[in-house]
Amino acid sequence: MKTLAPAVLPTYARTDVTFVSGEGCWLVDDAGQRYLDFGGGIAVVSLGHCHPAPLAAAQAQLERVWHTSNLYWTTPMAELAERLSERFGGARAFFCNSGAEAIEAAIKYARKATGKPGVVALEGSFHGRTVGALSVTGQPAKRTAFEPLLDGVAFARPNDVESLRAAATAETGLILLEPILGEGGVVPLDTAFLAAAEALSRELGALLCLDEIQTGVGRTGTFFAYEQLGVEPDLVTLAKGLANGLPIGALLVADSAPEGFAPGDHGSTFGGNPVVCAAASAVCDAIDEELLVNVRARGEQLRAGLPNKVRGGGLLLGLELYRSAAEVVDECRESGLIVLSAGETVLRLAPPLTVTEAEVDLALSILQEVLG
Protein backbone atom coordinates (compact mmCIF):
# COMPACT_ATOMS: atom_id res chain seq x y z
CA MET A 1 0.00 0.00 0.00
CA LYS A 2 3.01 2.32 0.17
CA THR A 3 2.48 3.13 -3.50
CA LEU A 4 -0.89 4.66 -2.60
CA ALA A 5 0.39 6.62 0.39
CA PRO A 6 0.88 9.91 -1.54
CA ALA A 7 -2.90 10.00 -2.09
CA VAL A 8 -3.65 9.90 1.66
CA LEU A 9 -3.09 12.76 4.11
CA PRO A 10 -0.49 11.65 6.69
CA THR A 11 -2.71 11.92 9.77
CA TYR A 12 -1.65 8.45 10.94
CA ALA A 13 1.80 6.83 11.13
CA ARG A 14 0.49 3.62 9.61
CA THR A 15 2.34 0.33 9.97
CA ASP A 16 3.20 -1.28 6.64
CA VAL A 17 0.63 -4.06 7.00
CA THR A 18 -2.49 -4.35 4.86
CA PHE A 19 -5.33 -6.43 6.29
CA VAL A 20 -7.66 -8.04 3.79
CA SER A 21 -9.98 -10.19 5.91
CA GLY A 22 -10.93 -11.07 9.45
CA GLU A 23 -13.03 -13.52 11.41
CA GLY A 24 -13.59 -13.58 15.15
CA CYS A 25 -10.39 -12.55 16.91
CA TRP A 26 -8.24 -13.08 13.83
CA LEU A 27 -7.01 -10.86 10.99
CA VAL A 28 -5.30 -11.87 7.73
CA ASP A 29 -2.97 -9.63 5.76
CA ASP A 30 -2.38 -9.50 2.01
CA ALA A 31 0.50 -11.97 2.34
CA GLY A 32 -1.72 -14.55 4.05
CA GLN A 33 -0.22 -13.98 7.52
CA ARG A 34 -2.69 -14.52 10.39
CA TYR A 35 -2.71 -12.28 13.46
CA LEU A 36 -4.49 -12.68 16.79
CA ASP A 37 -6.19 -9.32 17.30
CA PHE A 38 -5.93 -8.00 20.86
CA GLY A 39 -6.39 -4.41 19.73
CA GLY A 40 -9.86 -4.88 18.30
CA GLY A 41 -9.53 -1.89 16.00
CA ILE A 42 -8.85 0.18 19.17
CA ALA A 43 -11.68 -1.35 21.23
CA VAL A 44 -14.15 -1.23 18.34
CA VAL A 45 -14.74 -4.78 17.10
CA SER A 46 -16.72 -5.79 20.16
CA LEU A 47 -18.11 -9.09 18.83
CA GLY A 48 -15.13 -9.96 16.65
CA HIS A 49 -14.52 -9.49 12.95
CA CYS A 50 -17.45 -10.27 10.62
CA HIS A 51 -19.68 -11.46 13.46
CA PRO A 52 -22.75 -13.10 11.88
CA ALA A 53 -25.40 -11.16 13.87
CA PRO A 54 -24.52 -7.55 12.91
CA LEU A 55 -23.46 -8.79 9.48
CA ALA A 56 -26.88 -10.32 8.81
CA ALA A 57 -28.69 -7.29 10.23
CA ALA A 58 -26.73 -4.87 8.04
CA GLN A 59 -27.13 -7.04 4.93
CA ALA A 60 -30.89 -7.30 5.44
CA GLN A 61 -31.22 -3.54 5.90
CA LEU A 62 -29.11 -2.85 2.80
CA GLU A 63 -31.83 -4.59 0.81
CA ARG A 64 -34.52 -2.28 2.26
CA VAL A 65 -33.33 1.33 2.52
CA TRP A 66 -29.91 2.92 3.08
CA HIS A 67 -30.68 6.55 3.86
CA THR A 68 -33.70 8.82 4.22
CA SER A 69 -32.37 11.85 6.21
CA ASN A 70 -33.42 12.72 9.73
CA LEU A 71 -36.47 14.56 8.45
CA TYR A 72 -38.15 11.15 8.63
CA TRP A 73 -38.28 8.17 10.97
CA THR A 74 -36.67 4.82 10.27
CA THR A 75 -37.40 1.68 12.24
CA PRO A 76 -33.73 0.71 12.91
CA MET A 77 -32.94 4.11 14.43
CA ALA A 78 -36.01 4.03 16.67
CA GLU A 79 -35.34 0.44 17.74
CA LEU A 80 -31.72 1.19 18.64
CA ALA A 81 -32.78 4.23 20.65
CA GLU A 82 -35.26 2.05 22.54
CA ARG A 83 -32.62 -0.58 23.31
CA LEU A 84 -30.22 2.04 24.67
CA SER A 85 -33.01 3.74 26.61
CA GLU A 86 -33.78 0.43 28.33
CA ARG A 87 -30.11 0.09 29.28
CA PHE A 88 -29.89 3.66 30.60
CA GLY A 89 -33.12 4.14 32.52
CA GLY A 90 -35.34 5.87 30.00
CA ALA A 91 -32.63 7.95 28.33
CA ARG A 92 -33.13 9.70 25.01
CA ALA A 93 -30.54 9.29 22.25
CA PHE A 94 -28.91 11.46 19.62
CA PHE A 95 -27.05 9.51 16.93
CA CYS A 96 -24.01 10.63 14.98
CA ASN A 97 -21.01 8.97 13.31
CA SER A 98 -18.11 8.99 15.78
CA GLY A 99 -17.05 9.51 19.35
CA ALA A 100 -15.78 13.02 18.68
CA GLU A 101 -19.20 14.00 17.33
CA ALA A 102 -20.86 12.54 20.41
CA ILE A 103 -18.60 14.67 22.61
CA GLU A 104 -19.42 17.76 20.55
CA ALA A 105 -23.11 17.01 21.10
CA ALA A 106 -22.54 16.66 24.85
CA ILE A 107 -20.76 20.02 25.02
CA LYS A 108 -23.57 21.75 23.13
CA TYR A 109 -26.29 20.01 25.13
CA ALA A 110 -24.76 21.04 28.45
CA ARG A 111 -24.36 24.66 27.32
CA LYS A 112 -28.00 24.86 26.25
CA ALA A 113 -29.42 22.97 29.24
CA THR A 114 -27.47 24.79 31.96
CA GLY A 115 -26.81 28.16 30.34
CA LYS A 116 -23.18 27.84 31.45
CA PRO A 117 -20.27 27.37 29.01
CA GLY A 118 -17.55 26.06 31.34
CA VAL A 119 -16.21 22.50 31.19
CA VAL A 120 -14.07 20.57 33.66
CA ALA A 121 -12.20 17.59 32.17
CA LEU A 122 -9.16 15.60 33.26
CA GLU A 123 -5.45 15.81 32.61
CA GLY A 124 -4.45 12.91 30.37
CA SER A 125 -7.96 12.49 28.98
CA PHE A 126 -8.77 11.96 25.32
CA HIS A 127 -12.16 12.86 23.85
CA GLY A 128 -11.49 13.37 20.14
CA ARG A 129 -9.78 15.55 17.55
CA THR A 130 -12.48 17.96 16.38
CA VAL A 131 -12.07 21.46 17.79
CA GLY A 132 -14.61 21.04 20.57
CA ALA A 133 -13.51 17.53 21.53
CA LEU A 134 -9.85 18.55 21.38
CA SER A 135 -10.61 21.52 23.63
CA VAL A 136 -11.64 19.12 26.40
CA THR A 137 -8.79 16.67 25.78
CA GLY A 138 -6.16 16.92 28.51
CA GLN A 139 -3.10 16.15 26.41
CA PRO A 140 -1.07 19.27 25.49
CA ALA A 141 0.87 17.44 22.77
CA LYS A 142 -2.36 16.97 20.82
CA ARG A 143 -3.70 20.47 21.53
CA THR A 144 -0.81 22.91 21.13
CA ALA A 145 -0.66 23.14 17.33
CA PHE A 146 -4.37 24.01 17.15
CA GLU A 147 -4.67 26.60 19.90
CA PRO A 148 -6.50 28.78 20.70
CA LEU A 149 -9.30 26.32 21.34
CA LEU A 150 -12.56 26.78 23.27
CA ASP A 151 -12.49 29.08 26.27
CA GLY A 152 -13.72 28.07 29.69
CA VAL A 153 -12.16 24.59 29.85
CA ALA A 154 -10.23 23.60 32.99
CA PHE A 155 -8.39 20.36 33.71
CA ALA A 156 -8.17 18.49 37.00
CA ARG A 157 -5.86 15.68 38.03
CA PRO A 158 -7.48 12.21 37.88
CA ASN A 159 -8.60 10.86 41.26
CA ASP A 160 -7.76 14.16 43.00
CA VAL A 161 -10.94 15.61 44.50
CA GLU A 162 -9.29 18.85 45.62
CA SER A 163 -7.98 19.44 42.10
CA LEU A 164 -11.44 18.75 40.69
CA ARG A 165 -13.11 21.25 42.99
CA ALA A 166 -10.42 23.85 42.30
CA ALA A 167 -10.98 23.53 38.54
CA ALA A 168 -14.73 24.15 38.79
CA THR A 169 -16.39 27.57 38.90
CA ALA A 170 -19.90 28.97 39.00
CA GLU A 171 -19.77 28.95 35.18
CA THR A 172 -19.09 25.20 34.94
CA GLY A 173 -21.93 23.55 33.05
CA LEU A 174 -20.29 20.21 32.25
CA ILE A 175 -18.01 17.80 34.11
CA LEU A 176 -16.65 15.34 31.56
CA LEU A 177 -14.94 12.13 32.67
CA GLU A 178 -13.79 8.82 31.19
CA PRO A 179 -14.41 6.00 33.70
CA ILE A 180 -11.07 4.63 32.50
CA LEU A 181 -8.69 7.04 30.76
CA GLY A 182 -7.92 4.90 27.72
CA GLU A 183 -5.45 6.91 25.65
CA GLY A 184 -4.10 8.43 28.85
CA GLY A 185 -2.58 5.17 30.08
CA VAL A 186 -5.60 3.00 31.00
CA VAL A 187 -6.13 4.80 34.32
CA PRO A 188 -9.37 3.89 36.16
CA LEU A 189 -11.20 6.54 38.16
CA ASP A 190 -11.92 5.46 41.71
CA THR A 191 -15.41 5.42 43.13
CA ALA A 192 -14.74 8.16 45.70
CA PHE A 193 -13.58 10.53 42.97
CA LEU A 194 -16.61 9.77 40.82
CA ALA A 195 -18.95 10.26 43.77
CA ALA A 196 -17.32 13.63 44.44
CA ALA A 197 -17.71 14.58 40.78
CA GLU A 198 -21.40 13.70 40.85
CA ALA A 199 -21.92 15.68 44.05
CA LEU A 200 -20.04 18.66 42.61
CA SER A 201 -22.14 18.62 39.46
CA ARG A 202 -25.32 18.76 41.56
CA GLU A 203 -23.89 21.54 43.72
CA LEU A 204 -23.01 23.65 40.66
CA GLY A 205 -26.10 22.88 38.60
CA ALA A 206 -23.80 21.29 36.02
CA LEU A 207 -24.25 18.06 34.06
CA LEU A 208 -22.06 15.03 34.65
CA CYS A 209 -21.09 13.31 31.39
CA LEU A 210 -19.32 9.97 31.34
CA ASP A 211 -17.41 9.36 28.13
CA GLU A 212 -18.00 5.63 27.62
CA ILE A 213 -16.79 5.65 24.04
CA GLN A 214 -14.09 3.13 24.94
CA THR A 215 -15.50 1.56 28.11
CA GLY A 216 -19.12 1.09 27.02
CA VAL A 217 -20.99 -1.72 25.25
CA GLY A 218 -19.74 -4.44 27.58
CA ARG A 219 -16.02 -3.67 27.38
CA THR A 220 -15.47 -3.65 31.16
CA GLY A 221 -17.86 -6.48 32.06
CA THR A 222 -21.13 -4.54 32.29
CA PHE A 223 -22.92 -2.79 29.44
CA PHE A 224 -21.83 0.59 30.84
CA ALA A 225 -18.74 0.88 33.03
CA TYR A 226 -20.57 3.28 35.35
CA GLU A 227 -22.83 0.41 36.48
CA GLN A 228 -19.90 -0.84 38.58
CA LEU A 229 -19.01 2.56 40.00
CA GLY A 230 -22.01 3.77 42.00
CA VAL A 231 -22.62 6.92 39.99
CA GLU A 232 -25.59 8.14 37.94
CA PRO A 233 -24.50 10.36 35.03
CA ASP A 234 -26.70 12.89 33.28
CA LEU A 235 -25.09 12.22 29.90
CA VAL A 236 -23.26 9.25 28.40
CA THR A 237 -21.35 9.18 25.12
CA LEU A 238 -20.91 5.98 23.12
CA ALA A 239 -19.22 5.05 19.83
CA LYS A 240 -16.46 2.52 19.05
CA GLY A 241 -17.94 -0.91 19.83
CA LEU A 242 -21.60 0.03 19.42
CA ALA A 243 -21.87 -1.17 15.80
CA ASN A 244 -18.90 -3.57 15.75
CA GLY A 245 -16.88 -1.39 13.39
CA LEU A 246 -19.51 0.46 11.39
CA PRO A 247 -19.34 4.23 12.05
CA ILE A 248 -21.64 5.38 14.83
CA GLY A 249 -21.68 7.66 17.85
CA ALA A 250 -24.39 8.40 20.38
CA LEU A 251 -25.20 10.89 23.09
CA LEU A 252 -27.55 9.49 25.72
CA VAL A 253 -29.41 11.97 27.92
CA ALA A 254 -30.85 10.73 31.20
CA ASP A 255 -34.58 11.13 31.67
CA SER A 256 -33.85 13.24 34.77
CA ALA A 257 -31.57 15.69 32.94
CA PRO A 258 -32.85 19.18 32.11
CA GLU A 259 -34.11 19.83 28.59
CA GLY A 260 -31.41 20.87 26.15
CA PHE A 261 -32.00 20.35 22.46
CA ALA A 262 -35.01 21.50 20.48
CA PRO A 263 -35.55 20.97 16.74
CA GLY A 264 -32.81 22.77 14.83
CA ASP A 265 -30.33 22.94 17.74
CA HIS A 266 -28.19 20.04 16.54
CA GLY A 267 -28.08 17.42 13.83
CA SER A 268 -26.11 14.99 11.69
CA THR A 269 -26.76 14.11 8.06
CA PHE A 270 -25.72 10.48 8.47
CA GLY A 271 -26.51 10.08 12.17
CA GLY A 272 -28.97 7.27 12.83
CA ASN A 273 -28.24 5.64 9.49
CA PRO A 274 -30.60 2.65 9.23
CA VAL A 275 -27.93 0.17 8.09
CA VAL A 276 -25.59 1.09 10.92
CA CYS A 277 -28.39 1.19 13.50
CA ALA A 278 -29.58 -2.26 12.45
CA ALA A 279 -26.07 -3.60 13.06
CA ALA A 280 -25.85 -1.76 16.38
CA SER A 281 -29.12 -3.26 17.61
CA ALA A 282 -27.74 -6.71 16.81
CA VAL A 283 -24.66 -5.87 18.87
CA CYS A 284 -26.79 -4.70 21.80
CA ASP A 285 -28.82 -7.91 21.65
CA ALA A 286 -25.61 -9.96 21.74
CA ILE A 287 -24.30 -8.21 24.86
CA ASP A 288 -26.10 -10.57 27.23
CA GLU A 289 -25.07 -11.88 30.64
CA GLU A 290 -23.34 -14.92 29.15
CA LEU A 291 -21.07 -12.71 27.06
CA LEU A 292 -20.43 -10.35 29.99
CA VAL A 293 -19.41 -13.33 32.12
CA ASN A 294 -16.88 -14.17 29.41
CA VAL A 295 -15.56 -10.59 29.43
CA ARG A 296 -14.98 -10.73 33.17
CA ALA A 297 -13.47 -14.22 33.09
CA ARG A 298 -11.11 -13.52 30.20
CA GLY A 299 -10.07 -10.26 31.85
CA GLU A 300 -9.15 -12.10 35.04
CA GLN A 301 -7.31 -14.73 32.98
CA LEU A 302 -5.23 -11.99 31.36
CA ARG A 303 -4.49 -10.33 34.68
CA ALA A 304 -3.35 -13.61 36.19
CA GLY A 305 -0.99 -14.33 33.31
CA LEU A 306 0.60 -10.91 32.85
CA PRO A 307 3.95 -10.32 34.55
CA ASN A 308 3.77 -6.59 35.31
CA LYS A 309 1.37 -4.21 37.02
CA VAL A 310 -2.03 -4.35 35.30
CA ARG A 311 -4.87 -1.84 35.56
CA GLY A 312 -8.22 -1.33 33.89
CA GLY A 313 -11.31 -3.48 33.85
CA GLY A 314 -12.80 -6.40 31.93
CA LEU A 315 -11.19 -6.51 28.50
CA LEU A 316 -9.72 -3.01 28.60
CA LEU A 317 -6.40 -3.52 30.34
CA GLY A 318 -3.17 -1.58 30.59
CA LEU A 319 0.17 -3.22 31.33
CA GLU A 320 2.98 -1.07 32.72
CA LEU A 321 6.26 -1.72 30.95
CA TYR A 322 9.89 -0.97 31.68
CA ARG A 323 10.68 -0.13 28.07
CA SER A 324 9.09 1.46 25.02
CA ALA A 325 5.50 0.36 24.44
CA ALA A 326 5.90 1.10 20.72
CA GLU A 327 8.75 -1.40 20.52
CA VAL A 328 6.68 -4.05 22.29
CA VAL A 329 3.76 -3.42 19.92
CA ASP A 330 6.09 -3.99 16.95
CA GLU A 331 7.61 -7.14 18.42
CA CYS A 332 4.20 -8.60 19.24
CA ARG A 333 2.97 -7.91 15.71
CA GLU A 334 6.03 -9.65 14.27
CA SER A 335 5.05 -12.64 16.44
CA GLY A 336 1.46 -12.59 15.18
CA LEU A 337 -0.25 -10.63 17.98
CA ILE A 338 -1.87 -7.21 17.55
CA VAL A 339 -1.76 -5.03 20.67
CA LEU A 340 -1.91 -1.28 21.36
CA SER A 341 0.05 1.33 23.26
CA ALA A 342 -1.41 3.91 25.63
CA GLY A 343 1.45 6.29 26.25
CA GLU A 344 5.18 5.69 26.14
CA THR A 345 5.36 2.76 28.57
CA VAL A 346 1.85 1.30 28.78
CA LEU A 347 0.63 -1.61 26.66
CA ARG A 348 -3.13 -1.65 26.04
CA LEU A 349 -5.16 -4.80 25.45
CA ALA A 350 -8.70 -4.58 24.03
CA PRO A 351 -9.60 -7.85 22.28
CA PRO A 352 -13.09 -8.68 21.05
CA LEU A 353 -15.46 -9.53 23.89
CA THR A 354 -15.93 -12.97 22.32
CA VAL A 355 -12.27 -13.95 22.82
CA THR A 356 -11.86 -17.53 24.04
CA GLU A 357 -9.83 -19.03 26.86
CA ALA A 358 -7.51 -20.68 24.32
CA GLU A 359 -6.98 -17.40 22.48
CA VAL A 360 -6.08 -15.64 25.73
CA ASP A 361 -3.60 -18.42 26.49
CA LEU A 362 -2.01 -17.94 23.06
CA ALA A 363 -1.81 -14.17 23.52
CA LEU A 364 -0.23 -14.61 26.94
CA SER A 365 2.39 -16.99 25.57
CA ILE A 366 3.38 -14.44 22.91
CA LEU A 367 3.44 -11.58 25.42
CA GLN A 368 5.54 -13.58 27.86
CA GLU A 369 8.03 -14.41 25.11
CA VAL A 370 8.26 -10.79 23.96
CA LEU A 371 8.50 -9.33 27.47
CA GLY A 372 10.95 -11.95 28.67
Regions found by a protein language model. Give the residues of each.
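Conserved N-terminal phosphate-binding loop of PLP-dependent enzymes in the Aspartate aminotransferase
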Residues: M1-G372
